[in-house]
C-alpha cells in the first residue's frame, strides 16, 4: 500500500542549494520517508524505525564510506 506523503513536512540539509538533494519526512508511526528533491512526484522509500536506526548506525560507524584507490 502506498501512503500519500504530499502533505508531509520534508526537510533537507542546509548545505543543499539545488534540486539534487535527499529529502526526509518523519511519519507519525515512527517510520521515515526518503525522496529525491528533483523527482518529488515519484514514490518515496519508506523505512520502519528499526531499518532507519540500522542505517543511521551504519553511517556513524563508517559502513558506507567509500575507499579511494
Can you say where each PLM-predicted feature lies in the sequence?
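Positively charged, low-complexity terminal tracts
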Residues: 1-69
Amino acid at each position: 500500500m502506498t501512503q500519500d506523503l504530499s502533505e508531509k513536512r520534508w526537510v533537507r540539509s542546509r548545505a543543499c542549494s539545488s534540486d539534487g538533494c535527499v529529502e526526509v519526512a518523519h511519519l507519525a508511526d515512527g517510520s521515515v520517508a526518503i525522496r529525491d528533491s528533483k523527482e518529488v512526484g515519484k514514490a518515496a522509500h519508506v523505512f520502519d524505525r528499526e531499518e532507519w536506526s540500522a542505517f543511521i548506525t551504519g553511517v556513524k560507524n563508517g559502513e558506507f564510506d567509500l575507499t579511494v584507490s
